[in-house]
Amino acid sequence: MPQTIAEKIISNHSGRRVKAGEFVIADVDLTAVQDGTGPLTVEELKKAGFTKLANPARTILFIDHAAPSPRKELSNSQVVLRNFAKETGAILSEIGEGVCHQLLAEKYVNPGEILIGADSHTCTGGALGAFATGMGSTDVAVGMALGKTWLKAPQTFKIEVEGAFKKGVGAKDLILHLIGVIGADGATYKALEFHGSTIRNMEMADRFTLANMAVEAGAKAGLFFTDEKTRAYLAERGRGDNFKLISADEGADYEKVIKIDASSLEPTVSCPHTVDNTKTVGELKDIKVNQVFIGTCTNGRIEDLRIAAEILKDKKVNPGTRTFITPASRDVMLAALKEGLIEIFVKAGASVQTPGCGPCVGVHGGILGDGEVCLATQNRNFQGRMGNTKGFIYLSSPAVAAYSALKGYISDPREILK
């Protein structure tokens, strides 16, 4: 029987042919936690009596959410991870290295693998043809200790995207539009499998954006076939030998097929307080923006920063719109320095922050004041997400965010991108 990508990868890790809906115990290739979820994982491991990890070299502890830490309680949680790494041989990713999902892609995830992480956006790794999914701290603790996990093979939605984007429109607009169509819980425990000419022509940075936000429709995973672009991405990072072809079988069974014409899309924004509350930029009038944030595991890659720099070059951000730019990793920061992007941002009046999650999680780096509006390239706009339940968060592409920083209100970047 033909299989989806999810069914294939899970079958290869469970010793038998698996179809959607079946429960399996599957081998895990890679596990990850971050400084918000990791301390609980460590606590659960110790409570269960585990003293060794199944694969320390493939167990990664990231300090990225409160990096640098703004208060002692968070600093103490980070000490827990540092000590655990010393005790077990797990890999520690320190403050300034970057966001866990970006670093997993840059350094660790390979096609055909199963990655479980104690963070919702672990699904980012699906862009590399891996079954990457977020789980709770306790589930990840078991995976770290035993090298196995228990899960149900998900049904799959096939997302077919054809056509070319208009100028000023891209992957972020596509995924926001898709979530608006599906709904915030419309794909709960499904895999989203991306297909079509638009996806084939898409660079890896944009595939990561799509995979990253699959969970915002409730999805278990966001999955991609592998191709020469995947191979090149891995080879550039010293993992070319780990490339393998991953694809769904012809005739695989999909619960639903959703077709999108990329050429019909407009710059799209998610409005407070849910990601599926989407509107085109043209539908939003006179929405003043107090803060713009460009970065995160969704849109903090070098390609995203290039877009922002193109718009901000030789200009000044609106004096009433503070602007934060946070590279997703140290490698992205170094590339941005080499290309002169950081100078462009600083001269434009933006603040460039330490690689990491930045203001996204609302513990430091840009907490909103009462009634303030932030336009961010992150993946969530839940009430209180950026540290204040009285704040308002809109989500957009880097192009919309950068141009809005200049104008002081949510604006269409096509006015400047000719």
Swiss-Prot record:
Cofactor(s) required, per the database record: [4Fe-4S] cluster
Listed CDD domains: IPMI
Subunit structure, interactors included: Heterodimer of LeuC and LeuD.
Gene that encodes the chain: leuC
A Pfam family reported for this protein in Swiss-Prot or TrEMBL: Aconitase
Entry's Gene Ontology molecular function annotations: 3-isopropylmalate dehydratase activity; 4 iron, 4 sulfur cluster binding; metal ion binding
Name by which UniProt lists this protein: 3-isopropylmalate dehydratase large subunit
Native source organism of the sequence: Elusimicrobium minutum (strain Pei191)
Superkingdom of origin organism: Bacteria
Cofactor note: Binds 1 [4Fe-4S] cluster per subunit.
Function: Catalyzes the isomerization between 2-isopropylmalate and 3-isopropylmalate, via the formation of 2-isopropylmaleate.
